[in-house]
Amino acid sequence: CLSRGLGDVYKRQIIITFRCFLMIGRVPSESMEPTLMVHDWLIGDRHAYEEEKPQRGDIVMFYQKDENETMVKRVIGLPGETVSFVGGKVYINGEPLDESAYLDDTVETDCGEEDKTFTVPEGSYFMLGDNREISLDARYWKHTYITTDDMKSKEILIIPFHRLPWF
């Protein structure tokens, strides 16, 4: 009976430790496809940005004020940069952004307005979904930019349970 009680204590301790350091989320929409598919599970590091700053390309879970919900998007624009959209491509400070590490060359990005430019304030970040045709992201939010205070975790693991044959 004592060993069973200790087992419960250890289980609780593991859960508490896990929740303090990691965040679990589930992808609710197609906005990050093909990188993240609907119903994929994510594990994120809650403390990733305490010592380091977000980097372009990071996938982040964050609180979005306009939608009053937690979202998952990719960091595109860094503090002090200008982000613009020309001919279906993303430009950072006037240079085309190489997104080949995570997007197909055929992906087009626009804002509904050609040549729209955003200047990212200090301490803020510009976020986009990978599925640019349908993603509700910084191009359309009233509160365009996200701060590290809004960021809940940096994604460190994608678990595609629904795509695995034994689930």
Question: How would you describe each model-predicted region?
Answer:
Residues 34-167:
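Soluble "head" domains of membrane/secretory-pathway proteins
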